[in-house]
Regions:
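Active-site capping/gating segments
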Residues: 261-295
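A short glycine-rich, Lys/Arg-flanked "PGG" loop and its adjoining helix->strand segment in the class I
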Residues: 239-254
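Conserved SAM/SAH cofactor-binding pocket of Class I
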Residues: 138-222
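Conserved short alpha-helix immediately C-terminal to the canonical SAM/SAH-binding motif I
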Residues: 195-199, 237, 264
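Conserved hydrophobic residues forming the short capping helix/wall of the S-adenosyl-L-methionine
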Residues: 73-77, 204, 208, 272
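Short, conserved active-site loop motifs that form the nucleotide-linked donor/cofactor pocket
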Residues: 113, 212-213, 253
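N-terminal auxiliary segments of SAM/dcSAM-dependent transferases
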Residues: 2-125
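Hydrophobic beta-strand segment of the Class I
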Residues: 228-231
Length: 295
């Protein structure tokens, strides 16, 4: 099956923002390449990249409208003040398209939660693990991006048993699935991209939680409130959706917001402060997680 491939050359400082943007609009996989043309995955939490210029490459489903994709990318890059020109082409499937999966390893978040690529084994150090098995080819946002890592670590320590969760902008469904594996009663995954919802369904089935996962397009408002709301999307979108997101938690419900660069945190906090008692911002690399309890 052919793919639609996007190359975006950017400075190192902008690479993670572009990576998150591509995830948000439905990329199936994302890789980073340095000036030496050596592919790299997003580093594990706490690690640093060593190059100054990066090409961010993403694959989209073959049915993706290239003109609409270009327009969406150019608009979003302009909003992020990133001076970059996307190169979009059709790519025929080859074996090396998934070769980067060889470098994807089991990762732990918090005390219990592990994300493990299909076919790999847990390391000996894992004790009483909660394991999510994923095909990384279906799931960008498999914990390797700092924003996803922040959310997964927060979920690992959250009071989830018996709770209802909404994952707004669910992408591949990793946060909703993690919540269910950690004891949530039901999760609702919401996304504007039909391909993201398909990937979420496949990942949920892989992990045996499909019967407790509701998936819906973001054009349709959620049918009920929830105890925990998670949104790992761009800061500008969080601010625009602040009123809608604030209407979703039950009284005393919790919210976790990510996809936010450190210098955007105060603007996001200001948008949500009228609705939530916000806690101290959590940081990882240049990204933050904002959590709070509904007033």
């Amino acid at each position: 099956m052919p793919w639609v491939q996007v190359h975006i050359p950017v400075e190192k400082a902008a690479a993670q923002a572009v990576e998150l943007l591509l995830e948000t609009i439905g990329a199936i996989s994302i890789t980073l390449t340095d000036a030496g043309d050596e592919p790299q995955l997003e580093p594990a939490p706490g690690e640093e990249r060593i190059w100054s210029e990066t090409v961010v490459t993403a694959l989209f489903e073959s049915e993706t409208d290239r003109q609409q994709l270009r327009s969406a990318l150019e608009t979003a890059l302009d909003q992020l003040n990133i001076n970059a020109t996307p190169v979009i082409e059709v790519l025929e499937e080859q074996e090396w398209e998934r070769a980067w999966l060889d470098d994807f390893k089991p990762m732990r978040f918090g005390e219990r939660l592990w994300v493990v690529p299909r076919g790999l084994q847990l390391p000996d150090e894992a004790t009483n693990p909660v394991v999510m098995t994923l095909d990384p080819g279906l799931a960008f946002g498999t914990g390797t991006h700092p924003t996803t890592a922040l959310c997964l670590e927060w979920l690992d320590q959250a009071d989830l048993p018996g709770k209802d969760v909404i994952d707004f902008g669910c992408g591949s469904g990793i946060l909703a699935i993690a919540a269910l594996l950690l004891g949530a009663r039901q999760a609702t995954g919401i996304d504007h991209d039909p391909q993201a919802l398909i990937a979420s369904e496949q990942n949920a089935e892989e992990n045996g939680v499909l019967d407790r996962l509701v998936l819906q397009n973001s054009d349709t408002p959620p049918q009920k409130s929830a105890d925990i709301i998670m949104a790992n999307i761009l800061a500008s979108v969080l601010i625009d959706l602040s009123t809608q997101l604030a209407s979703l938690p039950r009284q005393g419900g919790r919210i976790a917001l990510s996809g936010i660069l450190a210098d955007q945190a105060e603007d996001v906090r200001a948008a949500f402060d009228p609705y939530f008692r916000l806690e101290a911002t959590q940081n990882l690399d240049d990204w933050v997680l904002i959590t709070g309890t509904k007033r």
